[in-house]
Design a protein with these regions (language model features):
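PP2C/PPM-type serine/threonine phosphatase catalytic domain
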Residues: 1-214
Length: 214
């Protein structure tokens, strides 16, 4: 049984420049797709870039057979399609992008930028996006997506997040919470760890998706 939980909130400004998409594949209800993007701040178009990247990558993944998505080689072309779509959109700037599927006891995907995906499988942490390249960003037309894949051993948990999560929670605390807590408690504890004392605000846009199998 797979459970999905997500949370996204802006940090330090009015508009959330993160985006996410998570849903089951239309051809296989047991194949779940997840995308998280973090629009580049400090210049125009970050929010639109993140939205376009997630939606175009989701559309590209839905156009693939579920079986094909369990092969790492399928994922760089999906992210390249998102890169091209963002580059072609006059309102869009630059963004990160993580995309993956959880299907048939594997997690497979690709990433570019500094958003992240963390797997907890059989009690052990695996930083799946550790080899990704921060630049060039999605929207440049030259983003380089690095694929990843891992087997899933129950109970498992996959966290997909923007850098507003891992930077302000810290990797040590993040892994500790992900290994110990489950369900909405994971997201609640990560929020608490990242919020500023007093104001309760986030220092950066905070987006996390948790997919769990038990």
């Amino acid at each position: 049984m797979l459970a999905v939980h997500s949370f996204s909130e802006p940090g330090g400004h009015r508009h959330n420049e993160d985006a996410l998409r998570v849903q089951a594949h239309l051809l296989d209800p047991d194949c779940w797709l997840c995308f998280v993007a973090d629009g580049q701040g400090g210049q125009a178009g970050g929010g639109p870039a993140a939205q376009v990247a997630c939606q175009s990558a989701l559309d590209a993944a839905l156009a693939c057979q579920p079986e094909a998505l369990t092969h790492p080689s399928a994922w760089p072309p999906i992210l390249r399609q998102a890169d091209a779509a963002v580059a072609a959109d006059a309102a869009a700037g630059f963004t990160t992008l993580v995309g993956l599927c959880v299907c048939r006891n594997v997690v497979v995907g690709a990433s570019t930028g500094d958003s992240a995906a963390l797997l907890i499988s059989d009690g052990k942490p695996h930083h799946m996006t550790v080899a990704q390249h921060k630049n060039p960003p999605v929207g440049s037309g030259g983003a380089a997506a690095v694929p990843f894949a891992a087997a899933l051993t129950e109970p498992w948990r996959v966290l997909v997040m923007s850098d507003g999560v891992w930077k302000y929670v810290g990797w040590e605390r993040l892994i500790e919470v992900a290994c110990r807590a489950n369900g909405p408690a994971v997201i609640a504890e990560l929020q608490q760890a990242a919020r500023l004392p007093g104001s309760g605000r986030f220092q950066d846009d905070f987006t996390v998706v948790a997919l769990e199998g038990a």
